[in-house]
Amino acid sequence: MNLLDYKSRPILSLTSIFAAWKSFLLAIALGASIGPDYDTSTSLFFAIVHGASSPRSLATRLTRWDALYFMHDAVKGKVYEQEWAFGIGMPAAVRSICGLLNLQRWEALVAIAISHVSHLVAVLALYQLTIVLCNDRKLAYLASVVHVLSPAGLFISAPYAESPFACMSFVGNLLYAISLKSSPDSLKRNLAVVGAGLSYGISCTLRSNGLFGGVLFAVETVKCLLALRNGFSISKILRLVAPLIGGILVAVGFVAPQVLAWMRYCNGNEEQRAWCGHRIPSIYTFVQAEYWDVGFLKYWTPNQIPLFLLAAPMLTILLKSGTETMREPSRGLGAVAMGTNEESRLLVRTLAAIQTLLAVLAITNYHVQIISRLSSGYPVWYWWVASCLMDKQRQSLGYGVIVFITMYAAIQGGLFASFLPPA
């Protein structure tokens, strides 16, 4: 039996490639245990939280950088103000599973398991999303393989929110694409749109950039409102309800953590923090600026030039694939211009615009080096690379991207497991 036969056994083939690549990355992480850590934060954290009962080597090697915040939240809840920079979704999931199965002291390994399972689900969701949009099995397979080999590397194996975020985003995209294949007035379409909103809402609890998913529902709402200019009908009004509910669910996913923080810090008789008096009292934007110095052009300093250079290849891929696909969707999905409806092309263009916006914000506002892991949750560049691999004129470009992302992921894996930058 050929495990790599994408035509007859695509799911088995993708799962086999996924298992092989993850085994390779985990071997790198375990191999890094030979040398001493650059930073002792992990060992100190586990000593404080778990005492003499130290976790296994794999857990310590993957609990690096921001994973410490996620794991502290999973074990102790949000104790310090700066912890609100990180989503509540991943720690809540770990805490719930550990409580349900009585797996206290196993939080890190449970989080690692969640990351792996959600990454695999994301791979399969991307495959099915591509099939729904253009029915090209080879393109779907290649795009999913590129997602397996994501430059995010060990970040999507570690106790981070990147894998669950990609999972919920791709599931949301898939449900939205399924809705476009149904009759405009059908219950199936409306339920799929609401389900997509719920998925994106959950993604907002994992990473704040899940809010970009709301653009899909805003576009659909505008379309429905414009349709009302030609006359009112019950079906047109009902058609408007689903994207409105979907958009509200996305907003709730983003706002809910802010409300919880406001109730904790701003709703008592104690001295309130400065952000409580802001016009929009968001703890997230406050702690990002206060503790991580995130803001417009704040990262544009001479000492950050190496990080901009490090991020340049991935930014170039995101911008090039995004802008090309916005102009002509077939540059990303070869068959999307032929045999698919205008709604599907609009969806692809919207996803390309969201990806382009992410890249621009990474340049102007974010810590630019995180783009390699943020990119893992956006499908357009995977389609674009896959289409390059299938196009003889652009095939060398596609192979070049594959070589780059695999080398980047492998090297970054060794650095990550040793607690070395960049993060």
UniProtKB/Swiss-Prot annotation:
Pathway: Glycolipid biosynthesis; glycosylphosphatidylinositol-anchor biosynthesis. It is found in: Endoplasmic reticulum membrane. The chain crosses the membrane at residues 11-31, 106-126, 139-159, 160-180, 197-219, 240-260, 299-319, 351-371, 400-420. One of its GO terms (biological process) is GPI anchor biosynthetic process. Keywords: Endoplasmic reticulum, Glycosyltransferase, GPI-anchor biosynthesis, Membrane, Transferase, Transmembrane, Transmembrane helix. It holds the Pfam family Mannosyl_trans2. It is a multi-pass membrane protein. The lineage of its organism: Eukaryota, Fungi, Dikarya, Ascomycota, Pezizomycotina. Mannosyltransferase involved in glycosylphosphatidylinositol-anchor biosynthesis. Transfers the second mannose to the glycosylphosphatidylinositol during GPI precursor assembly. Its EC number is 2.4.1.-. GO terms for cellular component: endoplasmic reticulum membrane; mannosyltransferase complex. Belongs to the PIGV family. This is GPI mannosyltransferase 2. GO terms for molecular function: alpha-1,6-mannosyltransferase activity; glycolipid mannosyltransferase activity.
